[in-house]
Amino acid sequence: MKLLNSIHLYPPQHTCGAEYMAHWINKDIKANGGDVRVLLHQANHYRINSMYTYDGIDVFPPEEMVIERLLTWSDAIITHLDYTDWSIGIAQVFKRPLFHLIHNTSTYQRIVWAEDPQYIIYNSEWAKAQLNYDHPSIVVTPPCDWRHYDTNVDPSYNEAITLINLDENKGGHILRQIAEALPHRKFIGVTGSYSEPADKGQHTNQPPNVTVLPKTPTIKDVYAKTRILIMPSKYESWGRTATEAMCSGIPVISSGTPGLRENCGKAGLYFDREEVKLWVDQIEKLFNPKAYEKASKAAKIRSRELDPMASLERLRNFMRQSITDHKRKA
């Protein structure tokens, strides 16, 4: 299998959940005998003007001759988000099967209207139920390998309550309210690679007890200092950082969107994001050793239940069979 990613941005510069989902799928395909390359459409966003290799994956800026060579080289294309429309068009021109990584529940009309071969990879059962595109599909939750993300640090010795991405949707303004209500506690706020809504930006103006850190490709360093992860998100189709944190036994307090509930299951602690006092009270409860031990154990168990190896194997088989079927019909 020779898989071409047709996407806008990629790690290590762009550190969002969608890009890391793509990257872990790419790594798995390559580790199991396939080959993967990334066409980086918005390379100029980070002033990238030459090919680079990240974690074994080759990434190419969109030079005209390079684009044609990559498309000719490929057996199939995978895309998501910003370059869905472009990829549908170019896949038809080059007669390649196209796989769509679905990270949210917004309907993409071009996917609805697109002629076969289109294949859908939903990031949650909830997203599949909401969208139900009329194309062959599979559900693969964002791969978070606990063997990689477990910091092997006992989080009960940590002090920080952490929020990753300080935009409006993720609750950067709510972090401020919680931190102001708990001046005796320490907080970490990590800025994100994007802001939703964009015009509101990142809420970096935080109280003195909040350490604001820049976005980082080494998020484990943050988890190694984290006692509790908070996710007061308005919208979250899955919430990858919750899974990552649970790998180290870090309890997650979240707003309980359908995606977060599917992700965290019984290990999650859920509150309306506008009820700040409930968040404050729950944080204080988790400084009780017995309460923390129970929540931490549940988080770690849940992360092991989400072991991605079986679902990644199912995805490889789904993609290989889809490519084989396409070649047979061609």
Residue ranges and their predicted role:
Residues 71, 215-216, 221-226:
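Short alpha-helical donor nucleotide-sugar binding micro-motif in glycosyltransferases
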Residues 118-150, 157:
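Donor nucleotide-sugar binding/catalytic pocket of nucleotide-sugar-dependent glycosyltransferases
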Residues 146-206, 212:
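Conserved catalytic-core segment of nucleotide-activated headgroup transferases in glycan assembly
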Residues 222, 257-270:
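Short acidic/histidine- and often glycine-rich active-site loop of Leloir-type glycosyltransferases
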Residues 234:
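Aromatic "clamp/platform" in nucleotide-sugar-dependent glycosyltransferases that forms part
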Residues 251-254:
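Short hydrophobic beta-strand element within catalytic cores of glycosyltransferases
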Residues 268-276, 284-290:
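Conserved acidic donor-binding segment of nucleotide-sugar-dependent glycosyltransferases
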Residues 290-320:
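A charged, aromatic-enriched C-terminal amphipathic alpha-helix characteristic of glycosyltransferases
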